[in-house]
Amino acid sequence: MSDIAIIHFVNYKRGTRSRAAMRGVMLYVMKEKKTAWEGGPLVSGINCQVQSVYDDFLNTKLLYHKDGGVMFYHMVQSFPKGANIDPRAAHEATRRLAGYFEGCEVLVCTHIDREHIHSHCIINSVNFETGRKVAYGGRTDSGAARSQ
């Protein structure tokens, strides 16, 4: 069996264009019962603080007057059922992956409550360094990132 992770972007039927949706998904992915592991929860912030992640994302949007439209992107990295990977190693692998979203605030949460370990990345749609909106995934760009 292969231990290669699968990565996909979540497509929300209700959308990613509201503050409530952004807050809701952040609260869901940070649930302690899903992220609890030896020594504490598998939750990290890249270019943001876990304790204030919603405010950090929103403040970046407000700073650049980009608080409309797509608010966030949700990427999931899943390891196969029975994969030989430690939850901390899975979390670190996802943190490294999140580091490729240069200039973006990313919330990384690893869930261990299912038969397969998987990590969620909630990515701010506004680059905190440039103030530009970033687009990931979609049907027309084959997963490439583009700035607006």
Regions found by a protein language model. Give the residues of each.
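N-terminal nicking endonuclease/strand-transfer module with a His-rich metal-binding environment
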Residues: M1-Q148
